[in-house]
Design a protein with these regions (language model features):
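ABC-family P-loop ATPase nucleotide-binding domain
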Residues: 1-13, 311-336
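ABC transporter nucleotide-binding domains
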Residues: 4-9, 14-211, 216-217
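Preference for bulky hydrophobic residues occupying beta-strand positions
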Residues: 14, 27, 235-237, 269, ...
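ABC transporter nucleotide-binding domain
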Residues: 177-271
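Conserved short beta-strand edge segments in small beta-sheet-based binding/regulatory domains
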Residues: 258-261, 290-297
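Short proline/glycine- and acidic-rich turn/helix-capping motifs at secondary-structure junctions
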Residues: 263-272, 297-308
């Protein structure tokens, strides 16, 4: 028998005035996976997540979390999820232990159980030495780890992570990635929104690409890369080379649209087979297009995103009124 999906959403719509921030998005997240939602700022990622987390009403469409209807039974859904975002929602005047104890109490745990959960999470997230320090003394990475720990106080089976590594340095981002992988190993399901292509590539088993409120592609990282070609020819055009002629040659020989950076003269060409690279280079030579370097690599998610949307993932999409980051513990938690 097929297991109930962790998230099953169809035709999600959210409108703010004249802006259709989420425009008919479908999402299907399997139990036990990391599912990535990738898109630029303002694409609608956070708005979609907030609807799934019961933080925003759904204007049209439907969604279920482990089979529970998000609109009809929001209280039950909140018992199944944890949520954390790019802005830590912990109280700076309290210590790490006090913050976690408070979240446990808000979730209905008895005082002793909340304290035990706090100690367990401090150990799990390597924060024991800082347990009695006020949060004001924490680094950004420590705050983010504590915020994630708070979302796990009642061991929810589904975690929503809204751009959890935004603003972190590379080392701390790597540590957060390890923590997220550990959550899945321990049995959690993770829905991760991100604008970082490498983050989606590193973590997610499957990815939905969101642009201007719509889902424009979905698949595993390898499937998405294969959709724009099996290989990428990377060419550095020599200074003074005719860039327009080079693009025409690529279109004629490879039947593909090159991605050119005019300022640097760097051109990426998606290829259906690596053998096609030789044909393109011969065409350049016969036409007098000079190059200084060349390589053939697997396509990147950046090239996938550009091919699908016509712009990079670091570009701003339409304004997303809910896209200022999720810091949702206070809203999701209910005093019981």
């Amino acid at each position: 028998m097929t297991a109930t999906a962790a998230v099953d959403a169809a035709g999600l719509v959210k409108t703010f005035g004249q802006l259709r921030a989420v425009d008919g998005i479908d999402l299907h997240v399997r139990q036990g996976e990391i599912f990535g939602v990738l898109g630029p700022n303002g694409a609608g990622k956070t708005t979609a997540l907030r609807m799934l987390a019961t933080l925003l009403p759904i204007d049209a469409g439907q969604a279920r979390v482990f089979g529970v209807d998000v609109t009809r039974e929001p209280h039950r859904v909140r018992q199944l999820i944890g949520i954390t975002g790019q802005y830590a929602s912990v109280d700076e005047d309290l210590t790490a232990t006090e913050n976690l104890w408070m979240f446990g109490r808000l979730q209905g745990l008895r005082s002793a159980d909340a304290r035990a959960a706090a100690q367990r999470l401090l150990a799990q997230f390597d924060l024991e030495e800082a347990a009695d320090k006020p949060i004001a003394q924490f680094s950004g990475g420590m705050r983010r780890r504590l915020d994630l720990a708070a979302s796990l106080i009642t061991r929810p089976p589904l975690i929503f992570l809204d751009e959890p590594t935004t603003g972190l340095d590379p080392r701390t981002r790597g540590q957060m990635w390890d923590t997220i992988r550990d959550l899945v190993t321990e049995g959690c399901t993770v829905l991760l929104t991100t604008q970082y292509l490498d983050e989606a590539d590193q973590l997610a088993g499957r990815i939905a690409v969101i642009d201007r409120g719509r889902k424009v592609a979905e698949g595993t990282p390898d499937e998405l890369k294969a959709s724009v070609g099996n290989s990428t020819l990377q060419v550095q055009l020599a200074e003074g080379s005719d860039q327009e002629l080079a693009q025409q040659i690529v279109r004629k020989i490879a039947g593909a649209e090159p991605v050119l950076t005019p300022e640097s003269g760097r051109m990426n060409v998606p290829l259906d087979t690596a053998d096609r690279a030789a044909d393109v280079l011969i065409g350049f030579r016969q036409s007098g297009v000079a190059i200084t370097s060349v390589s053939v690599d697997k396509p990147t998610l950046d090239e996938v995103f550009f091919a699908i949307t016509g712009h990079g993932a670091d570009a701003d999409g339409e304004s997303d009124p809910a896209g200022t980051g999720t810091s949702g513990h206070e809203t999701v938690l209910e005093v019981q």
